[in-house]
Amino acid sequence: GGYYFPKISGLITSLTASIQNRAGSWRQLSNEGDTPIQTRTYAQMWFNHGLNPTNGKYAYILLPNRTQAQTQTYSQNSGIQILALSNSVHAIKEIVSGIIGANFYGPGNISFINSLNQSSVILKEKDGILDFSAADPVQNQDLLTFELTKNAKSVISKDSKITIVSLSPIKFTVNTTNALGKSFNIKFEL
């Protein structure tokens, strides 16, 4: 697999990498582990943030099962746009498909999406259809609320835990009580 580190203004890009042999036993980590010493080779990567960094930011994309050549090709044209990389939200858009993925670490907004809670969302708008999925990744909230700066003609489908507040503009809630991080989906006709 590979890693891609976007070169974006304001991001830390000084990556250091090393390969090391490390030795130790499970017993050294806990009183219950095995005692034989095991030696393994590990790769390690880190960004040097310096001492006491303020708002240090970096971004990377995991590319599982990609060869070195495929990773190099991807780095020339990733097709990914970083929409937000702030304390309140991290969001990306896959340019060709138009899919947006976002993690809100509290109330925040990106593009046309306003989340009033911590949440994870993934959505796609195509041919007048907005397909929107949301989850409570921290699994401790009972209700997620979303406000979109778009109007909908109708709801095509929705999970039963979603309540429509308004279609113009779009506003809805997601009941995540005991959902254990499950995603809930709604589709709008725009």
Regions found by a protein language model. Give the residues of each.
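Non-catalytic terminal regions with compositionally biased, polar/charged low complexity
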Residues: 63-190
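C-terminal (or distal) subdomains of carbohydrate-active enzymes
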Residues: 1-96, 100-104
